[in-house]
Amino acid sequence: MAMTVHCDIVSAEGEIFSGLVEMVIAHGNLGDIGIAPGHAPLITDLKPGPIRLIKQGGEAEVFYISGGFLEVQPNMVKVLADTVQRAADLDEASAQAAVLAAEKALNEKGADFDYGSATARLAEAAAQLRTVQQIRKKFGG
């Protein structure tokens, strides 16, 4: 039997996942990070994108987070996310529409334009779309 670590994924809405996993793969500030049992303790920020859990038995479950933090302790991994959605609940058409709306907002700069906010919305929408496309490509969903 493979070694496991307890993982919690929590957002402002509440606990989204709690259980034993063999691996957690997340999109950190410096790139993807994989956490397996016995990983050194750390805290890092997470960019918008997928969180992939490899559960006991090798089954994968994917979530989309809009950003947050990852904490690793000797027997526990905790993801504190701004918002979380199960990847299966994401809609590609909605994600594509959000990307187009964010790109349009960037192109039509008005007097009260906030570039930082507009680019953040575009990055989040693009990450959501990438998550949907990755899942469809890997799992045929």
Swiss-Prot record:
A GO molecular function held by the record: ATP binding
Entry keyword Cell membrane: yes
Membrane topology, from the record: Peripheral membrane protein
Predominant localisation class: membrane
Compartments where found: Cell inner membrane
Keywords: ATP synthesis, Cell inner membrane, Cell membrane, CF(1), Hydrogen ion transport, Ion transport, Membrane, Transport
Cellular component aspect of the GO annotation: plasma membrane; proton-transporting ATP synthase complex
Domain of life assignment: Bacteria
SUPFAM superfamilies named in the record: Epsilon subunit of F1F0-ATP synthase C-terminal domain, Epsilon subunit of F1F0-ATP synthase N-terminal domain
Subunit comment: F-type ATPases have 2 components, CF(1) - the catalytic core - and CF(0) - the membrane proton channel. CF(1) has five subunits: alpha(3), beta(3), gamma(1), delta(1), epsilon(1). CF(0) has three main subunits: a, b and c.
Family, per entry: Belongs to the ATPase epsilon chain family.
Function of the molecule: Produces ATP from ADP in the presence of a proton gradient across the membrane.
Protein name (Swiss-Prot/TrEMBL): ATP synthase epsilon chain
Origin species: Pseudomonas syringae pv. syringae (strain B728a)
Lineage of the species this protein comes from: Bacteria, Pseudomonadati, Pseudomonadota, Gammaproteobacteria, Pseudomonadales
